[in-house]
Curated annotation (Swiss-Prot):
Localization of this protein: Cytoplasm
Protein name (Swiss-Prot/TrEMBL): Argininosuccinate lyase
Reactions catalysed, as given in the entry: 2-(N(omega)-L-arginino)succinate = fumarate + L-arginine
Family recorded in the similarity comment: Belongs to the lyase 1 family. Argininosuccinate lyase subfamily.
Family matches, as HAMAP family: Arg_succ_lyase
Pathway given in the UniProt record: Amino-acid biosynthesis; L-arginine biosynthesis; L-arginine from L-ornithine and carbamoyl phosphate: step 3/3
Keywords noted in UniProt: Amino-acid biosynthesis, Arginine biosynthesis, Cytoplasm, Lyase
Primary localization class, coarse: cytoplasm
Keyword Protein transport applies: no
Root EC class: lyase
Length: 470
């Protein structure tokens, strides 16, 4: 059939293959709430500016509200012949109220319409993501508080480096998620200008009030340049960049969970309700949720790359290529939310095996740095000299198949004759951890203070809980 909305200059209808490649209703119908909100704000502005009558505006708005209820209830029938969410809604509005429906599109284009819809949807998603991240942060805070002095090995190069506390280790992820939340808030501020009223690219000759629409939709202001308004997808790229950084943080934690629950570590035990089994090996208990978070990370990274490649060669202003911006964002947002919830569920159902963590922390000479520091403080060696000396003492312990604190004073004196009995006071992992009192260090007293700061952050954080706060 001939397209009723843009078919005036065409003599034949689009071919089936053209309809198939051109349609976006299969995925952009998710924008129906934003599209209707934008249309209602636009309609109110048209009435205020006397571009359409109050009666016409009432008919249009009532019709849009009916359509929204139909879509929400699942009774609305979408058509691929009508391409996208905008034309599906307008077509059904025309069926309901007649040709007056056509006045809704006065002084606007689908170019500024979709940009407005998409910003509204991304803004709403930021609220959801930030809320989920704060819930995950609270879970991390709870576990850290319960384990502020639980000793575990800290790693570099995945080899035991120095003893730390589990609370301190987990608070590192708390800080990562804080930065993620900050990035979402920054994006909201940067993207919160309204494209509506920019029309196709050049603005419009109608006496519209763009500030009114922006205010109705809770934007900070209208966009400053109509060409930029319809061709800008920086906010899409930034959304996917933020999502990529956030899922990278979750992937790192997921990787540690996978390692920690393995037979080789046995630091933690995952609950049965967040693990799966093997179809052939009955003994298996697999950390599939963590592995899927790690796997979905690549998927979200790919979404960012996809939109960068789409946008890199587009001249101003709008090109149909930009229709390809929706699916990667929808997919990334949904998967990131799922991964945050899965991580929260895993951590809320985790068992900490403290004794195994402590035993591991006591291996591989994890207090060697404490010994090197002691030599500097007490024997007036330079750190380079103490580093060399400590390395020799570690080698001596290796040769004797013992831990550092199991060496005798006489054995140590063969390396450095001036060493004294006091050295043994710093060779235990507990003393090592307790001594790390520099700001941001792993000492339990520091962890307690970090947890207090974390609680204050969560109680004071300004989150975008609803569209009314935007």
């Amino acid at each position: 059939m001939k397209n009723p909305l843009w078919g005036g200059r065409f003599t034949v209808s689009p071919s089936d293959i053209m309809k198939k490649i051109n349609e976006s209703i299969s995925f952009d119908k998710i924008l129906y709430e934003e599209d209707i909100s934008g249309s209602i704000a636009h309609c109110k502005m048209l009435v205020n500016q006397k571009i359409i009558s109050k009666y016409e505006g009432q008919l249009i708005i009532h019709g849009l509200e009916v359509i929204q209820n139909q879509i929400s209830s699942g009774t609305f029938e979408f058509s691929t012949d009508l391409e996208d969410i905008h034309m599906n809604i307008e077509h059904h509005l025309k069926k309901m109220i007649g040709n007056i429906a056509g006045k809704l599109h006065t002084a606007r284009s689908r170019n500024d319409q979709v940009a407005t819809d998409f910003k509204l949807w991304i803004r709403k998603s930021i609220v959801k993501l930030e809320t989920l991240l704060h819930e995950l942060q609270q879970t991390i805070l709870n576990i850290a508080e319960a384990n502020y002095d639980t000793i575990m090995p800290g790693f570099t190069h995945l080899q035991i480096a120095q003893p730390v506390t589990l609370g301190h280790h987990l608070m590192a992820y708390f800080e990562m998620l804080k930065r993620d939340c900050s990035r979402w808030q920054d994006l909201h501020k940067r993207m919160n200008q309204c494209p509506a009223g920019s029309a196709a690219l050049a603005g419009t000759s109608f006496p519209i009030d763009r500030h009114f629409i922006a205010q109705e939709l809770k934007f900070d202001s209208p966009t400053e340049n109509s060409i930029d308004a319809v061709s800008d997808r920086d906010y899409v790229i930034e959304f996917l960049s933020n999502a990529s950084i956030c899922i990278m943080h979750l992937s790192r934690l997921a990787e540690e969970i996978i390692l920690w629950c393995s037979y080789n570590f046995k630091f933690i035990t995952l609950s049965d309700n967040i693990t799966t089994g093997s179809s052939i090996m009955p003994q298996k208990k697999n950390p599939d949720a963590a592995e899927l978070i790690r796997g979905k990370t690549g998927r979200i990274f790919a979404s960012l790359n996809q939109i960068l490649v789409v946008m890199k060669g587009l001249p101003l202003a709008y090109s149909k290529d930009m229709q390809e911006d929706k699916e990667p964002v929808f997919d990334a947002a949904n998967n990131l939310m799922l991964c945050i919830e899965a991580m929260n569920s895993m951590l809320n159902n985790i068992t900490i095996n403290k004794s195994n963590m402590l035993k591991a922390a006591e291996h591989d000479y994890s207090t060697a740095t404490d010994l090197a520091d002691w030599l500097v403080k007490n024997l007036n060696l330079s750190f380079r000299e103490s580093h060399e000396t400590t390395g020799q003492i570690v080698k001596l312990a290796e040769q004797n198949h013992c831990k550092l604190h199991e060496l005798t004073l006489e054995q140590m004196k063969t390396i450095i004759p001036s060493i004294t009995e006091d050295v043994f006071s710093i060779l235990s992992v507990k003393n090592s951890v307790d001594s790390r009192t520099s700001y941001g260090g792993t000492a339990p007293a520091n962890v307690i203070e970090a947890i207090k700061r974390g609680k204050l952050y969560l109680s004071n954080i300004t989150t975008l809980h609803s569209e009314n706060n935007m």
